[in-house]
From Swiss-Prot:
It is found in: Cytoplasm. GO terms for biological process: methylation; response to metal ion; response to tellurium ion. It catalyses: S-adenosyl-L-methionine + a thiopurine = S-adenosyl-L-homocysteine + a thiopurine S-methylether. GO terms for cellular component: cytoplasm. This is Thiopurine S-methyltransferase. GO terms for molecular function: thiopurine S-methyltransferase activity. It comes from the Bacteria. The keyword NAD does not apply. Belongs to the class I-like SAM-binding methyltransferase superfamily. TPMT family. InterPro entries: SAM-dependent_MTases_sf, Thiopur_S-MeTfrase_Se/Te_detox, Thiopurine_S-MeTrfase, TPMT. S-adenosyl-L-methionine binds at W10, L45, E66, R123. Its EC number is 2.1.1.67. It comes from Pseudomonas syringae pv. pisi. Keywords: Cytoplasm, Methyltransferase, S-adenosyl-L-methionine, Tellurium resistance, Transferase.
């Protein structure tokens, strides 16, 4: 999945993956992580997600990472905020009270760039990546996060043979195989979301399961 694909989607306004409201699973399960207010929370491939505003409103300092400058600018415009913009290496950093978004290639970020993040939140990053990039994503996430950390991860699982991503299917078996060595993986919620996917219904899928995981680094 090349960067140009996502840049073109944002440029054309083809952002069906964007949720205009705060994710209900985030609101329901975030407290399971027991993250102390004031901690830094990484949100990879954040887009203009309202979930960042919710996390900031709970007292966390949000550290977003996003490829599309258009997405970042729209986020702050819709919040009615004028961010302070600086250049940090290959990144343009947009900052406002309670949030900073690093605009550039997520895989070029370093732990030094983002500081000590006690937790991460991923609703749209892992499922945005095809299978050949997901393992690299996990490895880079582990390089960014400290040893004592946790995360809330939301994925989808469906018959990938019937429907091309994105969003891509992330089988539970794959997740446990790749992540269980360094993380305690606990499924805390989930539901069949096929009824809300016009593409899935048209493709003849029987299910499109959403899985919600709490991850604790071990």
């Amino acid at each position: 999945m090349k960067a140009d694909f996502w840049l073109q989607r944002w440029s054309a306004g083809q952002i069906g993956f964007h949720q205009s409201e705060v994710n209900k699973d985030l609101q329901q399960y975030w407290s399971s992580l027991n993250v102390v207010p004031g901690a830094r929370v990484l949100v990879p491939l954040c887009g203009k997600s309202q979930d960042m505003s919710w996390l900031s409103g709970q007292g966390y300092h949000v550290v977003g990472a996003e490829l599309s400058e258009a997405a970042v600018e729209r986020y702050f415009t819709e919040r009615g905020e004028q961010p302070h913009i600086t250049s940090q290496g290959d990144f343009k950093v947009y900052a406002a009270p309670g949030i900073e978004i690093w605009c550039g290639d997520f895989f070029a970020l370093t732990a030094r760039d983002i500081g000590h993040c006690a937790a991460f939140y991923d609703r749209a990053a892992m499922i945005a990546l095809p299978a050949d990039m997901r393992e690299r994503y996990v490895q880079h996430l582990e390089a960014l996060m400290p040893q004592a950390c946790s995360g809330l991860l939301i994925t989808l699982e469906y018959d990938q043979a019937l429907l091309e991503g994105p969003p891509f299917s992330v089988p539970q078996t794959w997740l446990h195989r790749v992540m269980s060595g360094n993380w305690e993986v606990t499924k805390v919620g989930g539901q069949d979301t096929l009824h809300s996917s016009a593409r899935g219904l048209k493709a003849g899928l029987e299910r499109m399961d959403e899985h919600v995981y709490v991850l604790e680094r071990v």
